Amino acid sequence: MNMDWKNLIINIPDYPKAGINFKDITPLLANGAGFKAAIEEMAMICERQNAIPDVLACPEARGFIFAAALAHRLGIGFIPLRKPHKLPREVAHINYGLEYGEDCLEVHKQDIKKGMRIMMVDDVLATGGTMHACMNLLQSLGAEIIGAMFLLELTALKGREKLGTAAVYSLIQD
């Protein structure tokens, strides 16, 4: 597809704090043709790579938008990884370090089956810390991670390196 993705993402300097160059994806979401094209391109990547998973999984929050739409397009399920105390059934969790602290994600244990083929999805790949933690959590429950897909990859932060041997796909590299 010949979509000029970068024109649909706005750089916001010094947000949410000084020194951070925030990538605002909401203009892409607000553009019907752009959003549809992004989902179609993600689906085509899965189809071309023969990488149709059993389900998609995604950490909250903005990635949910892409993962849910892509799961619908592919006709498969979507498993959310949530912040603590958001899921009502028995959960497995993982604590992981961030640049300035620690965070935790949870998933319903019974939703993950041994050998389940999962494609991870998120809006942005930055340092890779959150996605690495998600992948470790799901693998600890017996899932097979077949890859990770992102709308935007911030290549200078080298997040791809943190994801090990997983196939990494991104529509935009910046």
Swiss-Prot record:
Record localization: Cytoplasm
E.C. number(s) listed in UniProt: 2.4.2.7
Alphabetical keyword list: Cytoplasm, Glycosyltransferase, Purine salvage, Transferase
Biological process (GO), any one: purine ribonucleoside salvage
Keyword Transferase annotated: yes
Any one of the GO CC terms: cytoplasm
Pfam families on file: Pribosyltran
Pathway: Purine metabolism; AMP biosynthesis via salvage pathway; AMP from adenine: step 1/1
Keyword Glycosyltransferase on entry: yes
GO molecular function, one term: adenine phosphoribosyltransferase activity
Reactions catalysed, as given in the entry: AMP + diphosphate = 5-phospho-alpha-D-ribose 1-diphosphate + adenine
Function: Catalyzes a salvage reaction resulting in the formation of AMP, that is energically less costly than de novo synthesis.
Subunit structure: Homodimer.
Family, as annotated: Belongs to the purine/pyrimidine phosphoribosyltransferase family.
Name of the protein in its database record: Adenine phosphoribosyltransferase
Species assigned in the record: Dichelobacter nodosus (strain VCS1703A)
